[in-house]
């Protein structure tokens, strides 16, 4: 592990000297290489899918694991979009002259070597590799064992493109030890690794945060809520709720709990249930919900569960204050939404909720780098430092000060 990370650290110096034009050219070649090698990627993914079926992975996890021509094309397009983004490093963020006559510039620079630990989704391999390369960071990737064949195939294609351009393949590499012990070693290698970004289940995040000596930006679970206020346009509210839960249930920005104002519950809940029944969503509700519609009972534990599946909790609340109290208690700081036409109620919700993204009259499903115009993201940070929300190339940079003098002493 140490030799592997030494090579990654050494490679970071090579990357720091690459021009933006060269990086963009290599990224475009990577995108094309994914298209050219799509048959090999699909074959490798088929091995993972077969293993997943044998190991009884959930339908949501199987969906996250799948690679097909459409998803590979989306991966290639994502890399091209990253290439088209403004150069993130070497930018003068601020500048001034001191009383001593020193000219100071605050300049964006790469973080260095970034270890990314993730589960299930093979597209994370290409997305994060491209984002790190664009921002002049070396990436060390540790994907989930369920996607090992897919991740290795994708990394092989990207590394071949690097070598074709006389660049070390260690700029983008997979951790050689895929065991839990490998993760344990990686997160303590602060001599070589500058940042760890874990994205995955609650157990993974907790383990990394509790044991890492390397700095961590965590991408924690998405315990997302939508609150339908008494002054919502119900047709819009139902459309938003259906999208937030059913468009892709197995992702972190999908809604897990729907809160409905008690003032409209009797008329709204039957209509809401009818639409979720069409989507075959399993519904769980509080006692007040069960008095109005036929659903299973919800527990306190359910409110704290990220299902990543087509299952939804429902709760009737007495106005925006109780909705906020529920979210404060059970939310994970990811994405929260309110549907209302009342400006005062909306602002109260948006200002009171402490989350990376808060929505008015829109689905929580928009919390991702592509939708925010970042190209892609290495994940959605639930940290407050140093990045929050969809973490694109800006979040993969830090800064230093350049000071220009003319013989000044102190």
UniProtKB/Swiss-Prot annotation:
Q: Specify whether Nuclease is a keyword of the entry.
A: no
InterPro entries in the record: Ald_DH/histidinol_DH, Ald_DH_C, Ald_DH_N, Aldehyde_DH_dom, G-glutamylP_reductase_CS, Glu-5-SA_DH, GPR_dom
What PROSITE patterns does the annotation carry? PROA (PS01223)
User: Gene3D superfamilies in the record, alphabetically?
Assistant: Aldehyde Dehydrogenase, Chain A, domain 1, Aldehyde Dehydrogenase, Chain A, domain 2
Provide one Gene Ontology cellular component.
Answer: cytoplasm
Q: Which residues form a coiled coil?
A: none
Annotated EC: 1.2.1.41
Name of the protein: Gamma-glutamyl phosphate reductase
Q: Which gene encodes it?
A: proA
């Amino acid at each position: 592990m140490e030799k592997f990370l030494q090579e990654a650290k050494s490679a970071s110096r090579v990357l720091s000297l690459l021009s933006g034009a060269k990086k963009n050219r290599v990224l475009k070649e990577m995108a094309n290489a994914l298209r050219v090698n799509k048959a090999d990627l699909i074959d490798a993914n088929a091995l993972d899918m077969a293993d997943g079926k044998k190991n009884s992975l959930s339908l949501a996890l199987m969906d996250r694991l799948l690679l097909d021509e459409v998803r590979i094309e989306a991966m290639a397009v994502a890399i091209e979009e990253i290439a088209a983004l403004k150069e993130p490093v070497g930018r003068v963020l601020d500048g001034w002259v001191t009383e001593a006559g020193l000219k100071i510039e605050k300049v964006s620079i790469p973080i260095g070597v970034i270890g990314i630990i993730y589960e299930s989704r093979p597209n994370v391999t290409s997305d994060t590799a491209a984002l790190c390369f664009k921002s002049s960071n070396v990436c060390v990737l540790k994907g989930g064992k369920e996607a090992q064949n897919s991740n290795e195939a994708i990394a092989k294609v990207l590394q071949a493109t690097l070598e074709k351009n006389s660049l070390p393949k260690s700029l983008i590499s997979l951790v050689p030890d895929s065991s839990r012990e490998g993760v344990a070693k990686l997160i303590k290698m602060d001599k070589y690794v500058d940042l760890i970004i874990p994205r995955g289940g609650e157990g993974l995040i907790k383990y990394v945060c509790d044991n890492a000596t390397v700095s961590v930006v965590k991408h924690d679970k998405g315990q997302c809520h939508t609150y339908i206020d008494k002054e919502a346009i119900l047709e819009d509210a139902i459309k938003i709720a259906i999208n937030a839960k059913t468009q892709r249930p197995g992702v972190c920005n999908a809604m897990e709990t729907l809160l409905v104002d008690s003032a409209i519950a009797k008329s709204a809940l039957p209509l809401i249930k009818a639409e979720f029944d069409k989507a075959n969503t399993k519904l769980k509700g509080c006692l007040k919900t069960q008095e109005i519609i036929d659903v299973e009972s919800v527990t306190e534990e359910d409110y704290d569960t990220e299902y990543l599946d087509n299952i939804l909790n429902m709760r009737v609340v007495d106005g925006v204050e109780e909705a906020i109290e529920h979210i404060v208690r059970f939310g994970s700081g990811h994405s929260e939404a309110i549907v209302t036409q009342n400006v005062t109620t909306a602002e109260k919700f948006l200002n009171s909720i402490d989350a990376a993204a808060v929505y008015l009259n829109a689905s929580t499903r928009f919390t991702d780098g592509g939708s925010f115009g970042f190209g892609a993201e290495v994940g959605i940070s639930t940290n407050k430092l140093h990045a929050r929300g969809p973490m694109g190339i800006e979040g993969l940079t830090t800064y230093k000060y350049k000071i220009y003098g003319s013989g000044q002493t102190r």
